[in-house]
């Protein structure tokens, strides 16, 4: 099998997307790959990432490939966790403090920054509508993020997410209170939890804080 045929197969298995690093790992040199890109008229959509003309673009996965430290958060995390009925009009991610978000912001991505030691708190993964795995914050981290940014989002979205979380059987109040302490939103969280009709007894609260 020739190298172009090998690349054709790889392109098919990767749903029309190829990455330079992936191709090199498969034993194909960059010059050969670039000849292939020109021959097959692949589109360069980001550094080291190429798409075929008929590829369905998974924008969330592409964003993840471009900026690996970007974690889907806030309203976008609500979408992944079924805490909103609306698909996000723009993606929201969180990156470590020090990363320059100007390019992402110019593309319409809402970017939050957080110090490095808190960036990985609540980090998990989820599947995009196209079936790709991307990083996203868990339910409890998402609630804390919403509390921290509540003045920058629609009150209806914020309150709706809290009410839906309150009804979730998989909610973890102990973890939620632990995160709230780390992000310094514990006091305001208790107020909103009470409004959402979640009643935590005082002994349980003390156990969750400790």
Would you name each region that the model predicts?
Residues 40:
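Glycine-centered, phosphate/nucleic-acid-interacting loop/turn motifs that mediate DNA/RNA or nucleotide
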Residues 1-5:
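Short alpha-helical segments that sit at the start of domains
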Residues 6, 15-22, 26, 32, ...:
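Nucleic-acid-binding surface
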């Amino acid at each position: 099998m020739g190298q172009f045929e090998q690349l054709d197969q790889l392109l098919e298995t990767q749903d029309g997307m190829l990455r330079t690093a992936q191709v090199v790992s498969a034993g194909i040199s960059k010059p050969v790959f670039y000849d292939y890109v020109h021959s097959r008229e692949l589109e360069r959509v980001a550094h080291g990432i190429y798409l075929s003309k008929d590829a369905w673009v998974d924008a969330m996965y592409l964003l993840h490939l471009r900026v690996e430290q970007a974690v889907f958060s806030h309203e976008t995390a609500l979408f992944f966790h079924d805490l909103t009925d609306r698909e996000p009009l723009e993606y929201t991610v969180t990156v470590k403090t020090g990363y320059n978000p100007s390019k992402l912001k110019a593309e319409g991505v809402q970017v939050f920054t957080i110090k490095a030691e808190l960036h990985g708190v609540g980090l998990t993964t989820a599947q995009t509508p196209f079936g790709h795995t991307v990083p996203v914050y868990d339910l409890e981290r998402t609630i804390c993020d919403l509390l921290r940014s509540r003045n920058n989002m629609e009150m209806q979205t914020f309150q709706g997410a809290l009410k839906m979380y309150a009804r979730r059987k998989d909610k973890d109040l102990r973890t939620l209170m632990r995160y709230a302490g780390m992000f310094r939103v514990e006091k305001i969280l208790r107020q909103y939890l009470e409004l959402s009709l979640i009643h935590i007894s005082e002994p349980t609260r003390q156990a969750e804080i400790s």
